[in-house]
Amino acid sequence: MSSENSEYYSDKEEDSVVNNSSLGRSRKSSRLSKSSRLSKSSRPSSAGVVIDETQSEEEESQSSETAESEKSDESDNSQNSQESEDSEDDSVRPSARNTKRKPLGIPSDSEDEEDELEQRALSPSTRMSITGVRPQDLSDDDSEIEYSDEVQEGPTEAPTAEAVVPRYTTQFAGNIQNDLHSTIGAADSEVLDDSSGSDVLILSNKETPIEILSSTDDDATTNKENMSGPPFERPSKSLSPRSSAGASVVKTSKNLSQPTIQAVLKQKTSPAAPRRSRIKSEDQKVVSQVVYDEEMRKLAEKRVQVSDAEKLFEKVAHKLPDKGSQIMKRIDTLRRELAMDEQWISALRVQQSNVPAVRVVKPTLNPPRAPSIDTLDWDELSEAVNEIKPVYTGAQGMATFNNQKALTLESLKDLHVSLEDLPGPEVLAEDPVGLKVSLMNHQKHALAWMSWRERKLPRGGILADDMGLGKTLTMISSVLACKNGQEMSEGKDESSDSDSEDDKNKKRKSVTGWKSKGRKDTRRGGTLVVCPASLLRQWESEVESKVSRQKLTVCVHHGNNRETKGKYLRDYDIVVTTYQIVAREHKSLSAVFGVKWRRIILDEAHVVRNHKSQSSLAVCDLRGKYRWALTGTPIQNKELDVYALLKFLRCSPFDDLHTWKKWIDNKSAGGQNRLNLLMKSLMLRRTKAQLQSDGKLNSLPNKELRLIEISLDKEEMNVYQTVMTYSRTLFAQFLHQRAERETDFNYRSDANKPTYNQIKDPNGAYYKMHEKFARMAGSKKEVKSHDILVLLLRLRQICCHPGLIDAMLDGEESQTMGDHSSDSDTPEIDLLAQLNKLAITDTSTDGQQSVANAGDDGPPLLPDEARIAKASKNLLKRSNPVFNLHRPSSKINMVIQILKTSILKSSDDKAIVVSQWTSVLDILRDHLSKDGVATLSLNGTIPVKNRQDIVNEFNDRNNQKRVLLLSLTAGGVGLNLIGANHLLLLDLHWNPQLEAQAQDRIYRVGQKKNVIIYKFMCVDTVEQRIKGLQDKKLDLADGVLTGAKVSSKLTIDDLKGLFGM
């Protein structure tokens, strides 16, 4: 072995390479000169073959003279002495001529026999028949395939130490997969197809691989610019007698070494996908779509394994003797593998093949028709029901199970059959008589769908159109159509007082009619609308502005002077009330519960998504013939939200919680299919994007979202970082206490009793920890979960204005301040040391005294905490100008700047500023008033009866007050504020759905101007992490049923991310 190659090959590696050779061949190879070895440079073989440069080196050196002497004589007789079948025989067995070539000087013993067998097995003809590549030592008369004579016969220069060509490599060359074709196959194969998944291994980027072109590649470009090494040379073409389709001519490149049989067999059994350890260059990362999808599936499984392992570690690590060290090792291994897989898959590129692997059929464009709603066959649904097994197999248990199963199948069958006459999107109802405005097409279709739904059981459904698509006007049109007598004949012939629940539960009726606490039968009424308080006047305003006079009468049932008897409510066509009033009157069953309503409408029905709440229980007990739920988000937290709506609709038997959990919400594919059937038959949902893509909502203007990033100034950032440091410390203490609390609970449980050694040694580590936890639990310094949330609140308020934390503490915690009733009498304080108490108390100006006072009610502060407290002594005091509310913060300045330069500068544009805190809106109002900007305010302090007047005043084009300060909770739902086309979100909320509802106050049907949403975010703060949390929640949207967003609740992982831990 030469010194140049010594750094690449060791003796062990050399032995492993030639391990498959016989002993005699090894002895012959050892007598080869070093110069002969260096003269043989490795060359690639056909696609997928691993090249071994040590193969046949002795044959090339020993038979070179013999081959040269016999080449001329044999070439003259090759045409006359061989037939096509002889050539075929040579392709599958060793050549007789080659078997007789024996090098001189080799003794004829047992080793010679092994050498002869080795030569037969590795003869050029054998390798030619297997690989389809002509070896260099095969003379011209051995095959009838024409080869180019441009192959370099002489030796090449030995590679230097700096540029040594390794024996094995894992690199592809260029876009070789676009030009390679499989050469290993049946003898009677046709023109070979592209082998896009071949695992081609080329020895070096500096070498030219073999180019094998089919007969159809005449016009293909042979010089690939992005390929490594010299360009390909076009080989001459001829037809092989072994291929009836005309197999392409194979031209070998320069400096090729011959493949081995083992390498060929290895390639025949190797997978189509490239091995991850072999991919290094960009061109090697081209894979088929099937391989890419399979790798993505494996990556998803790996992520699930990592997540499961982490959850297992959190639950059982503290219970194990090794404290979960083995599980942690497994987690580390999985994380490393996951990181490698992600890095590898990110570099993959799906190959765009010109020849499709399967036949692609373009769908024919049919005339528009109603979409197929029934995607499941009834046999599949019924079989899925039969898969559920009873829990109790006794006589009573089986009877109950069979009864539930029969009711479930009957109800599903009715819903499945009802889909047969479901009106398609092209079915539109006429505008009812007395309506001043014309309905849009999607509203007309909703009116037709509602008329169809009221003829089925249950009578009613869920209108889940996107926010701002006119659900209120659609329902008013339905009420007007009912009064005009435009209902179907089934509705006229039926008893208007029949209740869907009464149809299913006859036992609830007595002979004399419906009885409740000894009073007479309830009275027949019109339509009851239950909505949030902020929408009371909007319903009244919609009826007055959209319906002709005297067509519909409206009563707002709200306030202390509302009617207390139902007989005074039955004469109105529409009675509007709130969820709070219904829940209050539910206790005495008065007023609204004394009327049997023709129609009950729940506006913003997601308010009652908790089926255990008082409002949900109250609305479910209301009596009515038709029951409707209006909501843009039927699911906000979980699938159980749908159960609350089905309970209100009285969709038997799924309005029973036990039946719901057993047959619907059972985490199975069958349960999901049954839920889909319920939603397809009971719910109608259209989004703005869907209607715009279908061309049915061309009147809606464009919507633009702008993210405004703000950097806090130096003073504000100092305050923020100080509070953040304390917050992280307190949160870490909270996590520590939480972990110890779980350990203590495990100690108390029977399944986790202390061991004998622990009992024997009462001073062990476990008991020390337990005593420490008991002392901590008994002290006043235990951190509660609400303390953590309050800290997050303080951090978010600092982003809006640092003065909010002082004002909030001074306002809300004034009762704990003792005699300090005014700012002038209150001494300087250390907010950091007292922040966890959420109160303002006396502290000394000396830092050490401050630390001592902080420890009066608990353990003293740690040295680090004392140092931080001392450093922040002057920073977190009222005398700091940053807490002055008259000083505009960075965010307030940016809001004022945008209002002046981008919005108010226009002649008629209006803006709405939304915030979660009215204190922020008050600060902004004061600064705007100094600049002469008049504003309107709508928040929780405004009486409900006056809120609609403020909305009407703001929507008036002639009104000069062009800025509305809106509270997110008071006015973020249901209001129609299309008078403005700019919305400024001052602060970010955990639940992005609330922000989306606020945006739809201006982006709704009737808006004529382009809408611009401004979202303000302070960078390098908790707001930036909240933005990431919002994006994650939006990515987890449940689009199967409604497209609604996931829960707004914060988890421990969310809190860790917010605190940067």
UniProtKB/Swiss-Prot annotation:
Enzyme Commission number(s) from the entry: 3.6.4.-
SUPFAM superfamilies the UniProt entry points to: P-loop containing nucleoside triphosphate hydrolases
Binding-site list for ATP: 465-472
Compositional bias segments (type: Basic residues): 506-522
GO CC, one annotated term: nucleus
Region (Disordered): 1-163, 212-253, 485-523
Biased composition range(s): Low complexity: 32-46
Keyword list, A-Z: ATP-binding, DNA-binding, Helicase, Hydrolase, Nucleotide-binding, Nucleus, Phosphoprotein, Transcription, Transcription regulation, Transcription termination
Protein name: Transcription termination factor 2
Gene that encodes the chain: lds
